[in-house]
From Swiss-Prot:
Physiological role: Involved in mRNA degradation. Catalyzes the phosphorolysis of single-stranded polyribonucleotides processively in the 3'- to 5'-direction.
Enzyme class (EC, first level): transferase
UniProt name for this protein: Polyribonucleotide nucleotidyltransferase
Organism expressing this protein natively: Acinetobacter baylyi (strain ATCC 33305 / BD413 / ADP1)
Domain spans labelled S1 motif: 624-692
């Protein structure tokens, strides 16, 4: 009798065969081993049977990790083992978390940990979709109140046709890289980058992916049934409706009035005062009944209902705007003297100080992946300090949210960057959020575009971004342009769109409810287009194209072409020659196999000095040209003269003078400087020199 009770489910998902398996590995957790094409991911889910005492939020943790052994690699570094999560691992952890989190019911506070480990990879595709399907399947057999399963799909666009789950090779040809996740009836999450595609193309990709993923959703349902998944016995806590009505009678009008205060900090102060008043009125001193927690929960519920009812009834939004109006915008560029490019972008109470720094090829980021080490010439780093929202906090490395927002902003900008062969600089953008009240990632897109143009980076087009929101009750809904932080928190959708006037470059969508229809997504996309064009218009009033020259403080670069056969002369033995040039000129030199040489110098003079040395090393000998040479060796029949670095020629005794020379040593000495003319270069490259009729110094 086997010690394993293995349950398997196989299905075809686009070009990949998918296998779900449980019962063989990690049997003390709810575990699914998922294989998709050449990728295998082990996904383990552990759910605590009870919530911790006093727990008032849902502690869901998703950790995605890639083991280097999965691709037959040994990790780098001193310890030769995997370290902290990479940026890519963090982003995929968030990608899995986002569509799963809204499918747990309100009031469910049991801790759940999802660990997805890539254990095998043929390096032809990402493991994110496989990990997402595995997480969905593992949750479906875990006995939690998970309203899934979900499916996930990647969508590409190649030659105008949508492609399901493209591999790396296909993505390199694709105008779109979109990941969509959802249930049988609803889209819950979208993450994408695109090459200036239309709203219709983006919506079509979302719907295509959602339709195709139904194969996976149905397969996971069948897999869970075969595994004997049991229904959750968790019961939602009942709300104190009597207390809610009392709070509503006493505070609904006051809360509604507080939400007409446009300034965020003043509004929060007013709401805090109302909450303190509610506690004083409804919570007795030395309370041991837990009513204080109920008052807190129900007061938040009342705030939620009040804001949503106001919006759906057509009243002005929190700051007095209608649903389509974008907040006031202020644009400043060149705000920092020494930065290569800088911009201060302010939209309402959200502000980003964004800088662009240009570097040489040595500044590129080296990224280790399962597919190998790759070089990244573009970085965008997003920082969200506590002071941006008027709070104190410990400063540390970037958190998951900051990494995610930085990647979204990067996606918004990347499609309009110039090609590397046209603009070979390494680019680093830093967005420091100095004020925040919603949509700071989209402010980062706007600021990045402005600072790039201020730095002289020739963008294909300026880009801007806008965050959209949604409030939906039954058949009534309102799409909100340029949402505030409160509208994000109290709404049903966070829908971010970045792009140029030509099309969308990035789209991110997180939906908290089911029932988001194609009509709603279409309305949101079209409303976002109008908002994006308004923001671009405001930006273009200040700067609409790259400055004619890059910053005087940025490194300069020159490009020359040399004979590929001469590359070894520039590099020298063990790299000695190129190292000497670099040390003497302080320039960075990048040589390609085809003979293209890029020289980066801190100044133009430094770059040109390095080029002069390279040209001297690689120059071709020209017959008839006179060179300043140095005698390096005397022989009976003449002398050998060095005329260029690494290039010697023979000065025959008969060519030393118009008069007869009996002994070479009578006229020339080793180390003597002479002027010589190239008389001939034979087909074997041997150089014949002459001093006849040449005036010597």
């Amino acid at each position: 009798m086997s010690m394993f009770n293995i349950i398997r489910k196989e299905f075809q998902f686009g070009q990949h065969q998918v296998v779900l398996e449980t019962g063989r590995v990690a049997r003390q957790a709810n575990t699914v081993l998922v294989t998709m094409g050449g990728v295998t991911v082990l996904v383990a889910v552990v759910a605590q049977p009870k919530a911790k005492a006093g727990q008032d939020f849902f502690p869901l943790t998703v950790n995605y990790q890639e083991k280097q052994y999965a691709a037959g690699r040994i990790p780098g570094g001193y310890g030769k083992r995997e370290g902290r999560a990479s940026e890519a691992e963090t982003l995929i952890s968030r990608l899995i978390d986002r569509p799963i989190r809204p499918l747990f019911p309100e009031g469910y506070f049991n801790e759940i940990q999802i660990t997805a480990t890539v254990v095998s990879s043929d390096k032809t595709m990402d493991a994110d979709i496989a990990a997402m399907l595995g997480a969905s399947a593992a949750l479906s057999i875990a006995g939690t109140p998970f309203r899934g399963p979900i499916g996930g799909a990647r969508v590409g666009l190649i030659n105008g046709e949508y492609v399901l789950n493209p591999n790396f090779e296909q993505l390199a040809q694709s105008d779109l890289d979109l990941v969509v996740a959802g249930t049988e009836s609803a889209v819950l999450m979208v993450e994408s980058e695109a090459k200036e595609l239309s709203e219709d193309q983006m919506l079509g990709a979302v719907l295509f992916g959602h339709d195709e993923m139904q194969i996976a959703v149905q397969a996971i349902k069948e897999f869970a049934a075969a595994a004997g998944a049991v229904e959750s016995t968790w019961v939602a806590p009942t709300k104190n409706e009597t207390l809610l009505e009392q709070l509503k009678a006493a505070f609904e009008a006051k809360i509604s009035e507080a939400y007409t205060i446009a300034v965020k900090q003043d509004r929060y102060t007013a709401l805090d005062a109302l909450y303190a008043e509610a506690v004083a009125q409804f919570v007795p001193e030395n309370d041991e009944t837990g009513i204080a927690d109920e008052v807190n929960e129900l007061f938040e519920d009342l705030k939620y209902r009040t804001v949503r009812d106001n919006i759906l009834s057509g009243k002005p939004r929190i700051d007095g705007r209608d649903t389509k109006t974008v907040r006031a915008i202020d644009v400043q560029v060149g705000v920092l003297d020494r930065a290569h490019g800088s911009a201060l972008f302010t939209r309402g109470e959200t502000q980003a100080l964004v800088t662009t720094t240009l570097g040489n090829t040595r500044d590129a980021l080296m990224v280790d992946t399962l597919a190998g080490t790759k070089t990244d010439n573009f970085m965008l780093h997003y920082n969200f300090p506590a002071y941006s929202v008027g709070e104190t906090g410990r400063e540390s490395g970037p958190k998951r949210r900051e990494i995610g927002h930085g990647r979204l902003a990067r996606r918004g900008v990347q499609a309009v960057l110039p090609a590397a062969d046209r603009f070979p600089y390494v680019i680093r953008i830093v967005s420091d959020i100095t004020e925040s009240n919603g949509s700071s990632s989209m402010a980062s897109v706007c600021g990045a575009s402005l600072s790039l143009m201020d730095a002289g980076v020739p963008l294909k087009a300026p880009v801007a971004g806008i965050a959209m929101g949604l409030v939906k009750e039954g058949e009534r809904f309102a799409v909100l342009s340029d949402i505030l932080g409160d509208e994000d928190h109290l709404g049903d959708m966070d829908f971010k769109v970045a792009g140029s006037a030509n099309g969308i470059t990035a789209l991110q969508m997180d939906i908290k409810i089911e029932g988001i229809t194609e009509e709603i997504m279409e309305v949101a996309l079209n409303q976002a287009y109008a908002g994006r064009m308004h923001i671009l218009n405001e930006m273009n009033k200040v700067i609409s194209r790259a400055r004619a020259e890059i910053s005087a403080h940025a490194p300069t670069f020159e490009v020359i072409t040399i004979n590929p056969d001469k590359i070894r002369d520039v590099i020298g033995k063990g790299g000695a020659t190129i190292r000497q040039i670099t040390e003497e000129t302080k320039a960075a030199i990048d040589i390609e196999d085809n003979g293209t040489v890029r020289v980066f110098g801190e100044t133009k003079a430094a770059a040109r000095a390095a080029i002069a040395k390279i040209q001297a090393l690689t120059a071709e000998v020209e017959p008839g040209k006179i060179y300043d040479g140095k005698v390096i060796r005397i022989v009976e029949f003449g002398a050998f003269v060095n005329i260029m670095p690494g290039t010697d020629g023979l000065l025959h005794i008969s060519q030393i003078s118009n008069e007869r020379v009996a002994n070479v040593s009578d006229v020339l000495k080793e180390g003597q400087d002479v002027k010589v003319q190239v008389a001939d270069v034979d087909n074997r490259g041997r150089i014949k020199l002459s001093m006849k009729d040449i005036e010597q110094a």
